[in-house]
């Protein structure tokens, strides 16, 4: 083992970091064993094609029960070294802030001078943001190719595969979602994109880099390695399913739908049926994953209520939002709604009013209430998020092509969601596929009526001016909404997407797993 040199910061830090780790810890059995482990894993990963051509890397924390995990030393494989020839003494030892505490000794020609992994800043993000115990960076071919199948996709999705059970927090029936970030010329330039993906996808344990590879982390080296094996298996399965024309992202893994329609729609008997004059789409579970709303939009609104109200308190828009909330809360208090607390008058002062508003809004969001006062405020908060590039709408990969096709056929497409019309426009105005509003003719929200009431769909059909309600096709993932729309005479299909609620047996509705089936 080379003597510990002066601390050199990879990602901030300095001499003070060197004092964190005693010489005894640096020379401990935990550190020595981790050096050996990384060398062994590099050899194994080389045979799997994950770290060929000196690419890829691995980092593991030196576990010591007497030291809190966040303070444990970090060991990393070096950059530009043949991974199958790695030796224990080749590893770098870093403090938690990225300062190098121990470097490998230079080797004679033809070896290059030692250099810490270019992945170090990205590894440190996973350690800091997820309290990881180990991180693997793989250049496995399957992790590269799977990002190329759809070069516009921002996510990899797969469901109903046994190996999903090997991914932390997932089961067989779950939809596994892995974010995809764009590659850059230099590894460290990926740091911000990786951090944003980790923040935006709180359930993920991996981030794909298009045309490059994948970063995978776990609580321990065993967890990271196990998940890495499962991820690579699933990517390989998706590629092979794609090659034989099967869709890996749907529960039944049926044929990939790529229907080209010109004069009508093919039904199950391959007869051409007249096209609908209008299509009305739900959002959650239909155009957009439920997880986007639950894991991204709702938390963003919840976490930014106070900031938004403080910054805009004196504007006419926010005064209107507050008045709506006051009215709603007064009604909630009268009805004994759980979580409702009185909102002081303006005389109590801005901070007192905002504190009460925040408490009520948080309770409403937690209860997933579909009320206008909440939806209107959320829309205004989300607007700021989109304007500041803190939010980006997400739609399923089959949605943009379908919208474009329907638009070309002269079919008018509308949105009907419990979210406000503003929130709807925001989602489709800035998506992972760009601005899709050019394909949409209008937006309906709960001001037209409750989505589970037939009267709402009668109102929509009268607003659209169709000759008969059956000229409208309504697509939703919710049985009660489908039932209400059918009662108004609309043609109805139910969207089956991973994570959607199960349907009653013998529900009697047509179902689709992709817009390509419409």
From Swiss-Prot:
Location of the region described as Methylthioribulose-1-phosphate dehydratase in the Swiss-Prot/TrEMBL record: 1-247
EC number: 4.2.1.109, 3.1.3.77
Names of the cofactor(s): Zn(2+); Mg(2+)
Pathway(s) where this gene product acts: Amino-acid biosynthesis; L-methionine biosynthesis via salvage pathway; L-methionine from S-methyl-5-thio-alpha-D-ribose 1-phosphate: step 2/6; Amino-acid biosynthesis; L-methionine biosynthesis via salvage pathway; L-methionine from S-methyl-5-thio-alpha-D-ribose 1-phosphate: step 3/6; Amino-acid biosynthesis; L-methionine biosynthesis via salvage pathway; L-methionine from S-methyl-5-thio-alpha-D-ribose 1-phosphate: step 4/6
GO cellular component, one term: cytoplasm
Residues at the catalytic site: 162 (proton donor/acceptor)
Keywords, sorted A to Z: Amino-acid biosynthesis, Hydrolase, Lyase, Magnesium, Metal-binding, Methionine biosynthesis, Multifunctional enzyme, Zinc
Binding site residues for Zn(2+): 137, 139, 212
GO biological process: L-methionine salvage from methylthioadenosine
Top-level taxonomic group: Eukaryota
Pfam families reported for this sequence: Aldolase_II, Hydrolase
InterPro entries xref list: Aldolase_II/adducin_N, Aldolase_II/adducin_N_sf, Enolase-ppase_E1, ENOPH1_eukaryotes, HAD-like_sf, HAD_sf, MethylthioRu-1-P_deHdtase_MtnB, MtnB_viridiplantae
Binding site for substrate 2: 417-418, 451
Catalytic activity: 5-(methylsulfanyl)-D-ribulose 1-phosphate = 5-methylsulfanyl-2,3-dioxopentyl phosphate + H2O; 5-methylsulfanyl-2,3-dioxopentyl phosphate + H2O = 1,2-dihydroxy-5-(methylsulfanyl)pent-1-en-3-one + phosphate
Protein residues bound to substrate 1: 119
Family note: In the N-terminal section; belongs to the aldolase class II family. MtnB subfamily.
Name used for this protein in its record: Probable bifunctional methylthioribulose-1-phosphate dehydratase/enolase-phosphatase E1
Origin species: Populus trichocarpa
